[in-house]
Regions:
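Pyridoxal 5′-phosphate
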Residues: 1-251
C-alpha cells in the first residue's frame, strides 16, 4: 500500500496524485490518499487519478467534527476496523452517527456546488497576500509550490525572527496564524515538514501559516500584511543575528 497526502496541510503543496497512482498500479500496489485538506476545495476524480482509497473529514468543509468519509474502490478488500455488527458493510461495527453523516453529506454537497467560485476568490486573496509579503518584507521565502497549492493556503518563513513571538504579536493585532499544524500546536520545535524539505532550523523557526476563507476581504489581507510588516521589523530590531547580518552586508 502507498499512502500519500493529496495536499500538505502546512505548506499547501498539491501532490501529483494521478502520477503517483499510476506508478502504484503499474507495480500492482494499492494507492490511498489522505485528502482531508483537498476534499471540497479542489476537484478530485478517483478514476482519473488512479485512487483506490481516499479519506476525508467533515470539519474541513464546514461540516460537523468527529465524522469522516472513506472511499474504497469496488473490489478492494480491507480488514474490518471494528469487529462486531454489520454496520458500514461490516467494516466498522457500532451505531451509525446519523447527525454526523447527514452533516458531512450536506457539507460536501454545498462545497461542490460553490467550489469553483469559492476557489477563485480564495486564490485571488492568496496571490495578493503572497505578492505583497514577498515584495514588501525582505529576507522572506514562500514555502510550498507557487501555483500547485491549495487555494486558501499561504506559508512563509521570515529570517531572523522567532515564530512564537510573531504569533503572539499577530494575535494582539487580531490576526490568527500558526507556525505549524494544529496537530503540533503548543510545540516550540520547528515544523517537521519544513525540516523535511531541507530548511535549516534557524529559518524553519520563523514560519507562518495563514489559512484564508472566501469570507475574507482584500481589506483584511492588506491589514494583515501591514501589521505583519511592523511585527517583522520590530522583532528583527531586537535580533542580534539580524544586527550582525546587516553589519556584514554594509561592509
Amino acid at each position: 500500500l502507498i499512502s500519500v497526502m493529496f495536499a500538505n496541510n502546512e505548506i499547501g503543496t498539491i501532490e501529483p496524485i494521478a502520477e503517483i497512482g499510476k506508478i502504484a498500479h503499474d507495480h500492482g500496489v494499492l494507492f490511498h490518499t489522505d485528502a482531508v485538506q483537498a476534499f471540497g476545495h479542489i476537484p478530485i476524480d478517483v478514476e482519473e487519478m488512479n485512487i483506490d482509497m481516499l479519506s476525508a473529514s467533515g470539519h474541513k468543509i464546514n461540516g460537523p467534527k468527529g465524522i469522516g468519509v472513506m472511499y474504497i474502490r469496488k473490489g478492494v478488500k480491507i480488514r474490518s476496523f471494528i469487529h462486531g455488527g454489520a454496520q458500514e458493510r461490516k467494516r466498522r461495527a457500532g451505531t451509525h452517527n446519523v447527525p454526523g453523516i447527514v452533516g458531512i453529506g450536506t457539507a460536501a454537497k454545498l462545497a461542490k456546488e460553490n467550489m469553483e467560485e469559492r476557489s477563485a476568490k480564495e486564490i485571488a486573496l492568496r496571490d495578493h497576500l503572497i505578492e505583497r509579503v514577498l515584495k514588501e518584507i525582505p529576507y522572506t521565502r514562500l514555502n510550498g509550490h507557487r501555483t500547485d497549492r491549495l487555494p486558501n493556503n499561504a506559508n512563509f518563513c521570515f529570517r531572523f525572527i522567532e515564530g512564537e513571538s510573531m504569533l503572539i504579536l499577530l494575535d494582539q493585532a487580531g490576526i490568527c496564524g500558526s507556525s505549524g499544524s494544529a496537530c503540533t500546536s503548543g510545540s516550540l520545535d520547528p515544523s517537521h515538514v519544513l525540516l523535511a524539505i531541507g530548511l535549516p532550523h534557524e529559518i524553519a523557526h520563523g514560519s507562518l501559516r495563514l489559512t484564508l476563507s472566501e469570507k475574507n476581504t482584500m481589506e483584511e489581507i492588506d491589514y494583515t500584511v501591514d501589521e505583519l510588516k511592523k511585527i517583522i521589523e520590530r522583532l528583527r530590531g531586537m535580533s542580534p543575528l539580524y544586527e550582525d547580518f546587516v553589519k556584514k552586508q554594509n561592509k
